């Protein structure tokens, strides 16, 4: 596997093999990545009386979350210790022979802001907005603005195309085509559906 350079990223974008829509400024394309911007939708956990989240109970996980849409030029403030789901402004589409990783920009990390907890890997064939799992591990509240560059996507070629890429009918492609921050769909995992077997 090899990481795509800016030259190759531009070529793949021009050919339509990789889609990032929209790229409004050529400066988003970095030496080996593309900067992605923050969307305007956020989801955070409500304070509830339930002692814990259990993937085996019947509660809809969406009921644990509150949603907010931030107006243009207004900030979303994330406080120390808080966690929120957000989304990229851009829609991303990958071919069957490219994987991607989303990494936080170092400028955000130096403020104590992480862009993903564990879901930084994007399978070949994925299409949609990318859900970000944003945490503030710093000691100060931080303002985040829709349209702000907050993360970068890195592309890697595979040794061969996937036989069953993300979105294939035989795949567990729960987040295919997502258009905003999506809550966990862990209850749709085959091992949860089968009672942990």
Curated annotation (Swiss-Prot):
Domain of life, per lineage: Archaea
Protein name, UniProt field: dCTP deaminase, dUMP-forming
Alphabetically ordered keywords of this record: Hydrolase, Nucleotide metabolism, Nucleotide-binding
Functional pathway: Pyrimidine metabolism; dUMP biosynthesis; dUMP from dCTP: step 1/1
Transmembrane segments: none
GO BP annotations listed: dUMP biosynthetic process; dUTP biosynthetic process; nucleobase-containing small molecule interconversion
Cross-referenced NCBIfam families: dCTP_deam
Active site: 133 (proton donor/acceptor)
Residue positions binding dCTP: 105-110, 123, 131-133, 152, 166, 174, 178
Signal peptide start and end residues: none
Catalytic activity annotation: dCTP + 2 H2O = dUMP + NH4(+) + diphosphate
GO MF annotations in UniProt: dCTP deaminase (dUMP-forming) activity; dCTP deaminase activity; nucleotide binding
Gene: dcd
Keyword set includes Phosphoprotein: no
Quaternary structure, from the entry: Homotrimer.
Its EC number(s): 3.5.4.30
Recorded family membership: Belongs to the dCTP deaminase family.
Its job: Bifunctional enzyme that catalyzes both the deamination of dCTP to dUTP and the hydrolysis of dUTP to dUMP without releasing the toxic dUTP intermediate.
Annotated positions for site Important for bifunctional activity: 120-121
């Amino acid at each position: 596997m090899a990481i795509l350079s800016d030259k190759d990223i531009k070529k793949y974008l021009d050919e339509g093999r990789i889609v990032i829509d929209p790229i409004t400024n050529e400066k988003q394309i970095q030496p080996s990545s593309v900067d992605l911007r923050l969307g305007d939708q956020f989801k955070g956990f409500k304070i509830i009386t339930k002692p814990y989240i259990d993937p085996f109970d019947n509660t809809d996980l969406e009921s644990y979350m509150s949603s907010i849409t931030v107006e243009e030029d207004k900030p979303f403030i994330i406080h120390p210790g808080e966690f929120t789901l957000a989304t990229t402004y851009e829609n991303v589409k990958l071919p069957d022979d490219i994987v991607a990783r989303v990494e936080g920009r170092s400028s955000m990390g130096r403020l104590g802001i992480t862009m993903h907890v564990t879901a930084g890997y994007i399978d070949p064939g994925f299409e949609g907005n990318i859900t970000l799992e944003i945490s503030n591990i710093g000691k100060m509240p931080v303002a985040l603005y829709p349209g702000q560059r907050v993360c970068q996507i890195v592309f890697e070629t595979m040794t061969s195309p996937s036989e069953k890429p993300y979105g294939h009918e035989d795949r567990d492609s729960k987040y295919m085509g997502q258009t905003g921050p999506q809550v966990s769909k862990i209850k749709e995992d085959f091992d949860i559906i089968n009672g942990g077997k």
